[in-house]
Curated annotation (Swiss-Prot):
Organism: Brassica napus (Rape)
CDD domains, A to Z: cyclophilin_ABH_like
Protein name: Peptidyl-prolyl cis-trans isomerase
Gene Ontology MF annotations: peptidyl-prolyl cis-trans isomerase activity
Cellular component terms per the entry's GO annotation: cytoplasm
UniProt key word Cytoplasm: yes
Regulation (activators, inhibitors): Binds cyclosporin A (CsA). CsA mediates some of its effects via an inhibitory action on PPIase.
One Pfam family named in its UniProt record: Pro_isomerase
UniProt xrefs under PROSITE patterns: CSA_PPIASE_1, CSA_PPIASE_2
EC nos: 5.2.1.8
Keyword annotations: Cytoplasm, Isomerase, Rotamase
Amino acid sequence: MVNPKVYFDMTVGDKAAGRIVMELYADTVPETAENFRALCTGERGIGKSGKPLHYKGSAFHRVIPKFMCQGGDFTAGNGTGGESIYGMKFKDENFVKKHTGPGILSMRNAGSNTNGSQFFICTEKTSWLDGKHVVFGQVVEGMDVVRDIEKVGSDSGRTSKKVVTCDCGQL
């Protein structure tokens, strides 16, 4: 099985920042990978929230340097929302993959079995998250873009410039 690759074309402020390409671990966490893949393509249409099940146009609302860049809340835009292709939330599939370093792609949650659409890209090793957040992919191209996003973050997570996924899809 070949794992799917997806992309985000990013803007920081009003400038194009470049493309992030991510490999999804469909061989290890197929349900989690499929959720993210389908949210990249937008192929599932409108969700229960009444909003498109699509990352296009959504922001990275929380960026903490030397930790992570978080996005995926396309319903509220501020970290309180989001929705999966399976309904509002879905279970933790497994914790086989670990938060081993920069570029790891993991699900943001609010406790066990509360995965939706929010995710984060690690900018450092974050082993304290192992067993709590499902790792489902990794950045394979565009880590420089992630580093540029990291530069507009702060200790509080607030960004100094708007960080937006202006386009996304599957390669």
